[in-house]
Curated annotation (Swiss-Prot):
Gene Ontology CC: one annotated term: cytosol
Protein name: Bifunctional purine biosynthesis protein PurH
GO biological process: 'de novo' IMP biosynthetic process
UniProtKB keywords: Hydrolase, Multifunctional enzyme, Purine biosynthesis, Transferase
Protein family: Belongs to the PurH family.
Gene: purH
Gene3D superfamilies for the chain: 3.40.140.20, Methylglyoxal synthase-like domain
Keyword Transferase: yes
Enzyme nomenclature, EC number: 2.1.2.3, 3.5.4.10
Source organism of this protein record: Chlorobium limicola (strain DSM 245 / NBRC 103803 / 6330)
Pathway: Purine metabolism; IMP biosynthesis via de novo pathway; 5-formamido-1-(5-phospho-D-ribosyl)imidazole-4-carboxamide from 5-amino-1-(5-phospho-D-ribosyl)imidazole-4-carboxamide (10-formyl THF route): step 1/1; Purine metabolism; IMP biosynthesis via de novo pathway; IMP from 5-formamido-1-(5-phospho-D-ribosyl)imidazole-4-carboxamide: step 1/1
Length: 525
């Protein structure tokens, strides 16, 4: 069978990128173009010859455009097998002309439901019905019909048509058909996921079944290590669509790596804890915070965060909860950093920071999506859990010691607790004056984490006398608390829940420590 020459095309797109030039070329190749609604107007306004789909169907677009292509003369023209004599006969008897090309992309459902203020009505109106129907009909009949959903394919198709006397190759039609079914499958999963969330049904535990759609958004140079392939995928589930581009824009620097993406997630998840609060700075290395501070100015917050660990920030990631100003930019510019993330960059700051070509500058355009599910792959399946997004307020704290914490201690305890859950377990964190003084992360023994945190503080001459300590899980024995008391701690925040809580409380009282229980553990693995 020879490749069919394209004589008639149906064009209806929501994304009009390149469509005028593409259709102009089709017209020059002798293709008759039919279109709908806004696409038809766009083509006609640009001087491209195109007729309304109604000239094929003999029926107007009705119900606010909900019904325009759902017609036998459309789908018969797409699905007819050209080598089947009965199909050809029935087409002639019913006045059905063959349609050789479909150019359709769908209503932007995923982009619509990703908007924080989207209404249910807006979401429903952006569920495309006619588009997927035409795409599936055309893709099913890919022996005869060329179907395009992506403007990136326009050039290849035009090239083949010029070289092939108006026809595309079988290999290209098959490739394009595969893209259609991948698109419609993802589109339907996104709708199902949104409606699942919109239903508002209370589910005890994780749902028995989940529908998750992944679409590659960014290529990664490599994975965690150079021998590993990797990519970044936008995710759509029952909570909506989540993508890098919705939250961030890379303004400068090399392409982002797999490890960069992990660090961006870690840094911004932590800086979100301080949204709307005093100027705050988070410095992250290998997804662990190595310095966090709040102050009256951003530059002072940076200097204090940096002073927690003056080595780890080199090659690290820094996130700010305020627009990055010139004073802070000058201070940061003194060291090599992989990535700087801010909600805005004040005048002149980008000019200064862009002088270092290897540094990535990332604009955080909006807050991170709240809640949702967290997925972790294992060699034997997928773990799914709610994100650790619950907030502990001051009124949730239970004072378990004889001494109540002072206002200053309470402020530092709450500051420490916000940070603690973002550090790899086991975690011991020393805080003083709204600044991390010692970070003990990722140790198998809680006592070892405490020793490391104390050692890190001593390395940079930070005095732990008068500090507070946070532990991501309960102290199983009093030894960890006694080590903190020996370091000069005056107050403690921890979940509680150990069978030896009374022993730990007695040790706190014996050392005149104030201790509060949160009732919430924050393991992080």
């Amino acid at each position: 069978m020879s490749d069919p020459v394209i004589k008639r095309a149906l064009v209806s797109v929501s994304d009009k990128t390149g469509i005028v030039d593409f259709c102009r070329e089709l017209s020059l190749l002798g293709v008759e173009i039919f279109s709908t609604g806004g696409t038809l107007k766009t083509l006609q306004d640009a001087g491209v010859a195109a007729a309304s789909i109604s000239t094929i169907t003999g029926f107007p677009e009705i119900m606010d455009g909900r019904v325009k292509t759902l017609h036998p003369k459309i789908h018969g023209g797409l699905l007819a097998v050209r080598e089947n004599a009965d199909h050809v006969k029935q087409a002639l008897e019913n006045g059905i002309g063959f349609i050789d090309m479909v150019v359709v992309n769908l209503y932007p459902f995923e982009a619509t439901v990703a908007k924080p203020d989207v209404t249910f009505e807006d979401a429903i109106e952006n569920i495309d019905i006619g588009g997927p129907s035409m795409l599936r009909s055309a893709a099913k009949n890919n022996e005869s019909v060329t179907v395009l959903t992506d403007s990136a394919d326009y050039a290849q198709v035009l090239g083949e048509m010029r070289a092939g006397a108006g026809a595309t190759t079988r290999a290209t039609r098959l490739m394009l058909a595969r893209k259609v079914f991948a698109l419609t499958s993802r589109y339907d999963r996104a709708i199902a996921a949104y409606l699942t969330g919109a239903a508002g049904a209370e589910v005890e535990g994780a749902a028995a079944g989940m529908t998750v759609s992944l679409e590659k958004e960014l290529d990664m140079r490599y994975g965690e290590n150079p021998h590993q392939n990797a990519g970044f995928y936008r995710l759509t589930d029952s909570e909506g669509s989540r993508s890098f581009g919705a939250c961030f824009e890379k303004l400068h620097g090399k392409e982002l790596s797999y490890n960069n993406m992990l660090d961006i997630a870690a840094a911004t998840s932590l800086i979100e804890e301080f949204r709307g609060e005093d100027p705050s700075v988070v410095i992250v290395k290998h997804t662990n915070p190595c310095g966090v501070a709040q102050a009256d100015t951003l530059v002072e917050a940076y200097r204090r965060a940096f002073s927690t660990d003056t080595q780890a920030p080199f090659g690290g990631i820094i996130a700010f909860n305020r627009p990055l100003d010139m004073d802070t930019a000058v201070a940061v510019n003194g060291i090599f950093t992989e990535i700087l993330i801010a909600p805005a960059f004040e005048d002149g700051v980008l000019d200064l920071l862009m002088k270092k070509k290897d540094r990535r500058l990332v604009l955080q355009k909006q807050p991170l999506p709240k809640g949702g599910w967290e997925f972790k792959s294992t060699p034997f399946g997928m773990l799914v859990q709610e994100r650790d997004a619950r907030i502990v307020a001051v009124e949730d704290l239970k004072v378990v010691t004889k001494r109540q914490p002072t206002e200053e201690e309470l402020s530092n305890l709450m500051f420490a607790w916000k940070i603690c859950k973002h550090i790899k377990s086991n975690t011991i964190l020393y805080v003083k004056n709204r600044q991390t003084y010692g970070v003990g992360a990722g140790q198998m023994s809680r006592v070892d984490s405490s020793k490391i945190a104390r050692w890190k503080a001593s390395e940079v001459n930070l005095d732990l006398n008068g500090s507070v300590v946070a532990s991501d899980a309960f102290f199983p024995f009093a030894d960890g608390l006694l080590a903190a008391a020996e370091a000069g701690v005056t107050a403690v925040i921890q979940p509680g829940g150990s069978i030896r809580d009374n022993e730990v409380i007695e040790a706190a009282d014996a050392n005149n420590l104030a201790m509060v229980f949160t009732g919430m553990r924050h393991f992080k693995h």
